[in-house]
Amino acid sequence: MTFEMLYSKIHRATITDANLNYVGSITIDENLAKLAKLREGMKVEIVNINNGERFSTYVILGKKRGEICVNGAAARKVAIGDVVIILAYASMNEDEMNVHKPCIVLVNEKNEILEK
């Protein structure tokens, strides 16, 4: 049996852009994504602290420092300046669950790393 467990998260990231006309996804600063162990195409859940919206999408690696841009239809669920939590999960068996420690990255309002 496997269980869906928290794999990693970026906590309290600030939305820097929302692009309704781009094909879906969330663009995340490549350095920040790598630090959080997120890979291009990986499914993530976004929790908007400002309005309570929760939605799933996939990661695109961005080039701009601090970039967090929600694309496509999901852009309607955020506003520039909103604070979000970006979560990734992984399927694990009980042995994996017992040793796994999620990667948690805390950022400031400019999406600069405070703590990992």
Swiss-Prot record:
InterPro entries: Asp_de-COase-like_dom_sf, Asp_decarbox
Catalytic activity: L-aspartate + H(+) = beta-alanine + CO2
Pfam family, one: Asp_decarbox
GO biological process: alanine biosynthetic process; pantothenate biosynthetic process
Residues found modified as Pyruvic acid (Ser): S25
Entry keyword annotation includes Membrane: no
Gene3D superfamilies named among the record's database cross-references: 2.40.40.20
UniProt remark on cofactor binding: Binds 1 pyruvoyl group covalently per subunit.
Binding site for substrate: T57, G72, A73, A74
Pathway assigned in UniProt: Cofactor biosynthesis; (R)-pantothenate biosynthesis; beta-alanine from L-aspartate: step 1/1
Active site residues according to the UniProt entry: S25 (schiff-base intermediate with substrate), Y58 (proton donor)
Family classification: Belongs to the PanD family.
Cited NCBIfam families: panD
Subunit structure: Heterooctamer of four alpha and four beta subunits.
Protein name in UniProt: Aspartate 1-decarboxylase
Organism: Helicobacter acinonychis (strain Sheeba)
Gene: panD
